[in-house]
């Protein structure tokens, strides 16, 4: 199942695409794969013959005239892999390449998961802030109502103070939510290798969540994990 099939929210897909293109860790992993591919190619070339060219020239005089002749010879030689040195090097390079590819896949998988987690966290924080704002307005209305009732002797100071305490508590909660949103946006911007900015996102009602993944990981599925495959390649 590809990440596009798992995460179908268009705005989230756009963020993931940006992350896959710009993330520094993933680009480093790509360079590791390219280096491993170059090493494997070098070991394969070791099986080819080494070529040599020999050039000779002579000058002979005959009846006052000088005749020049040139000869170019080519030779080829193979290094005998008597002790399996070349074969071992090739196998090691192939294992290193597979390990690098598994590492790149592990980085990519973690990157996609982190971006998605941050995205849905922001959507939930937005929903929480909307609810808190509405609740705050309701309590402010309650305070005004209780103060009006107090003036006509139908409420007391304790009720007003309790309502005001609830207002202050909600105001503090909203500050905390805004701070969490800012911190999450900054962290996600860093992952995307972009300056800190407001992250475009769907609201919680519109956000498309992936289907629930069943709990429990069979051994066959565990062996397909990129980080597990990388460890296997490094131990090979």
Please provide the spans of the model-predicted regions.
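Small/polar-residue-enriched beta-strand and adjacent coil segments characteristic
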Residues: 2, 10-11, 15-18, 22, ...
